[in-house]
Amino acid sequence: MEGPFISVEKKGAQDERNIITCNEEVCRRFLDASKGLVKYVGIAPERNEDAVSFIRAMKDKVNISLAHTNAGYDKAMEAFQAGANHAVHLYNAMPAFTHRAPGVVGAVCDSEHVDVELICDGVHIHPSMVRATFKMMGADRMILISDSMRATGMPDGQYTLGGLDVNAVSYTHL
């Protein structure tokens, strides 16, 4: 699940009305309702004063992912050291990876237990960055995803995504 404990600033196509802070009871209800189908829960640790406690409480019940987050390097490292073990669609819906502010990407590089997703559609991430990420992380940590939506392969036009209206133009709907 990419959320609902994510950042409003990095929400992407997520419906802002459904974004909430980390809540163990809500998370347990999701897990119980899914009868074991939910394997990952995405959080933005910077939105939650006590994200570390949430991660420690939930990490043995579900994989904790950093997703749709505006976390800097230190906050991401704190989450990974507490037990988060996954990063959702690396480079997308998170701060840029730079030499002075490595952000989530830098924290992932420094946390060998963390697996990463990459959207490999040739649009979300340049092919050179895909190759560089394989070199940085190693193939064993990589999960390649499409992140496609209902409009994939369809002509430009109006579509819906999670109940939201989307105007899909050109490559934006891959």
Where are these regions (language model features)?
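Conserved small/polar residues in nucleotide/adenosyl-binding loops
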Residues: 172-173
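Active-site core of metal-dependent hydrolases
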Residues: 25, 32-156
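Anionic-ligand binding region
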Residues: 153, 164-166
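Divalent-metal coordination cores built from histidine and acidic residues
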Residues: 2-37
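Short, surface-exposed, charged loop/turn segments at secondary-structure junctions
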Residues: 158-163
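Active-site donor-binding loop signature of nucleotide-sugar glycosyltransferases
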Residues: 3, 89, 168
